[in-house]
C-alpha cells in the first residue's frame, strides 16, 4: 500500500506531542549524527516543540568530519538548537585501557556513552529522550542495547529504512544527507551495507514479508524462498532476526516466589 507521507508527517507530529505530554514533559532531546534517521527525527521534533527540541552532537575520535558538518548544516537550515559534546576523550580512555578491544566493542562503548550523555542532559534540562532507530534496524537487531536503541519514545521505530528515505524527501532533508551511504559512524570505513551484506532496498521487502507472514509463528525460510527471495539472503536475514530478537524484549523478571 502506498503511504501518504504528508499525512504521515501530521500523524508522527501528533504522536510526539501527545506522548511527550502524556509523560509530563514539555522538552525533548535527541542525538544528531548527521545521518538520515536522526535528521528526520530532528526535523519532526522541531516542527512540534520548536526551541524546546534540543539536539546533541557527539562526535567520537573516529567520526567522519563531514557528518558533523552535515549535522550543523541541518541545525542551521531548520533553526534547531544544539550542543556539541565530543566523546573523543572518553573513547580514547577506553581504547587505552582495552588495547585488544574489537571494533564492535569500541562501537558499542561509543553508542552507550552517547546515550549516557543524552540521559544526563535530559535530567539537567527536564527533557525526554527521543529515539532515532528505524524498523529495519530494530527487526535486525542492528543497534546497541542500552545505546542507540535506548529512548523514551521513538517516532520512526515502525518505519522501514526505505520509508524513512521517502519521509525525509517530504521533509526537505538536505540531499547531502539523503545521498550518503547509511552508517552508524562507529569506526572508520563502517557502513550499514558492509555490516549487513545487502542494501536496504533489498532487505526491506523481505522484512515486510516476514512481518506480514510470521508475526505469530516461527519464520519459515522455505516459504520465503518460494516467494522468490535469494536463499542466502533469507538465511542471513532470518538468522540476524532470531539471534537479536532479545534486544526488543523487556528484561525477564522472575515472578514473586510464594513458598507454601
Swiss-Prot record:
CDD domains: NAD_synthase (cd00553). GO terms for molecular function: ATP binding; glutaminase activity; metal ion binding; NAD+ synthase (glutamine-hydrolyzing) activity; NAD+ synthase activity. Its EC number is 6.3.1.5. InterPro entries: NAD/GMP_synthase, NAD_synthase, NH(3)-dep_NAD(+)_synth, Rossmann-like_a/b/a_fold. Gene3D superfamilies: HUPs. Mg(2+) binds at residues 37, 137. It catalyses: deamido-NAD(+) + NH4(+) + ATP = AMP + diphosphate + NAD(+) + H(+). Pfam families: NAD_synthase. Keywords: ATP-binding, Ligase, Magnesium, Metal-binding, NAD, Nucleotide-binding. ATP binds at residues 31-38, 132, 161, 183. Disulfide bonds: none annotated. Deamido-NAD(+) binds at residue 112. One of its GO terms (biological process) is NAD biosynthetic process. Pathway: Cofactor biosynthesis; NAD(+) biosynthesis; NAD(+) from deamido-NAD(+) (ammonia route): step 1/1. One of its GO terms (cellular component) is cytoplasm. Belongs to the NAD synthetase family. Catalyzes the ATP-dependent amidation of deamido-NAD to form NAD. Uses ammonia as a nitrogen source. HAMAP family: NadE_ammonia_dep (MF_00193). PANTHER family: GLUTAMINE-DEPENDENT NAD(+) SYNTHETASE (PTHR23090:SF9), NH 3 /GLUTAMINE-DEPENDENT NAD + SYNTHETASE (PTHR23090). This is NH(3)-dependent NAD(+) synthetase. It comes from Helicobacter pylori (strain ATCC 700392 / 26695). The gene is nadE.
